[in-house]
Amino acid sequence: MSIMDERLLSGESAYEDADLEYSLRPQTLRQYIGQDKAKHNLEVFIEAAKMREETLDHVLLYGPPGLGKTTLANIIANEMGVNVRTTSGPAIERPGDLAAVLTSLQPGDVLFIDEIHRLHRSIEEVLYPAMEDFCLDIVIGKGPSARSVRLDLPPFTLVGATTRAGALSAPLRDRFGVLSRLEYYTVDQLSAIVERTGEVFEVEINSLAALEIARRARGTPRIANRLLRRVRDFAQVRGNGTVTMEITQMALELLQVDKLGLDHIDHKLLLGIIEKFRGGPVGLETVSATIGEESHTIEDVYEPYLLQIGFLQRTPRGRIVTPLAYEHFGMEMPKV
């Protein structure tokens, strides 16, 4: 089992997050906290489409996991007053799977494809005419007698979500009219999300405690809500049910989440480079072997936050741990 599967601070959705995220999900752009640039642009595009009585242009949402791409896809459907059909790149294994989904759509519907970068190229080719001309080309028969039949589709909006925009093929990426990058959240935005989640949980939470959880949530709402859920457990068992600063600090220390939101895996990655490779540079595959995790997981899940806070650098020669990370661990950088 991947160590990411057990990770409290992973931005990836876990099984236990599904019901919680559904209950916490805002229904409108007005209720949605953060992502102001993307939100304001979507407000204009949605309003313009409604005024023209057209479907919204296809939308690509990209950025690190846990920032609200699925939530925004559902909000787009709500704001347009249409239904949303949800699937994912790995779930669409054959062109026929995609054809079945497309032909089931009603006029104006939103089709949300999560992890769209994982679509097979043969499936992408079926998607191109569907996105451009709202039609589906189906090949009937085999060999010399095979013929292509074109089926008309109702106008729809494709919303694609990806953590790896660079992995999308250029022809697919170019067919999206709206591209929105989701950024990490500020501490104040996350604190507001934690307090809103506390209201849904019907748990009293001190404003300082909400800020402390926000500071350690790695700029990610999914992580903030997950941390609050665990801190709430400590508040009920070790306290009087109120999430206080004291309970929060105790809980997060026991959960091995430090003051910058780094956990034992981040420590293992950074200290591994420091202690075994004198801070780098060291290649990604070597780091992968050192901590026992796949290289693409390190690149997509672990490294973005470490790069964001300036603890790690990617260079042509490999990964380098920065002076900031040495300072965080109370260590001196080796002299060259």
Curated annotation (Swiss-Prot):
Binding site for DNA: R314, R319
Protein EC: 3.6.4.-
Ranges where the record places region Large ATPase domain (RuvB-L): 4-185
InterPro entries, per the entry: AAA+_ATPase, AAA_lid_4, DNA_helicase_Holl-junc_RuvB, P-loop_NTPase, RuvB-like_N, RuvB_C, WH-like_DNA-bd_sf, WH_DNA-bd_sf
Catalytic activity: ATP + H2O = ADP + phosphate + H(+)
Subcellular compartments: Cytoplasm
Transmembrane portions of the chain: none
GO biological process: DNA recombination; DNA repair
Segments of this protein annotated with the region Small ATPAse domain (RuvB-S): 186-256
Keywords from the UniProt entry: ATP-binding, Cytoplasm, DNA damage, DNA recombination, DNA repair, DNA-binding, Hydrolase, Nucleotide-binding
Gene Ontology MF annotations: ATP binding; ATP hydrolysis activity; four-way junction DNA binding; four-way junction helicase activity
Positions that bind Mg(2+): T70
Domain of life: Bacteria
Annotated Gene Ontology cellular component terms: cytoplasm; Holliday junction resolvase complex
Record's keyword annotation contains Cytoplasm: yes
Principal subcellular localisation of the protein: cytoplasm
Region (Head domain (RuvB-H)): 259-336
Family: Belongs to the RuvB family.
Domain comment as written in the entry: Has 3 domains, the large (RuvB-L) and small ATPase (RuvB-S) domains and the C-terminal head (RuvB-H) domain. The head domain binds DNA, while the ATPase domains jointly bind ATP, ADP or are empty depending on the state of the subunit in the translocation cycle. During a single DNA translocation step the structure of each domain remains the same, but their relative positions change.
HAMAP family given in the database record: DNA_HJ_migration_RuvB
Assembly notes: Homohexamer. Forms an RuvA(8)-RuvB(12)-Holliday junction (HJ) complex. HJ DNA is sandwiched between 2 RuvA tetramers; dsDNA enters through RuvA and exits via RuvB. An RuvB hexamer assembles on each DNA strand where it exits the tetramer. Each RuvB hexamer is contacted by two RuvA subunits (via domain III) on 2 adjacent RuvB subunits; this complex drives branch migration. In the full resolvosome a probable DNA-RuvA(4)-RuvB(12)-RuvC(2) complex forms which resolves the HJ.
Job of this protein: The RuvA-RuvB-RuvC complex processes Holliday junction (HJ) DNA during genetic recombination and DNA repair, while the RuvA-RuvB complex plays an important role in the rescue of blocked DNA replication forks via replication fork reversal (RFR). RuvA specifically binds to HJ cruciform DNA, conferring on it an open structure. The RuvB hexamer acts as an ATP-dependent pump, pulling dsDNA into and through the RuvAB complex. RuvB forms 2 homohexamers on either side of HJ DNA bound by 1 or 2 RuvA tetramers; 4 subunits per hexamer contact DNA at a time.
Protein name per UniProt: Holliday junction branch migration complex subunit RuvB
Species this chain originates from: Bacillus thuringiensis (strain Al Hakam)
Originating gene: ruvB
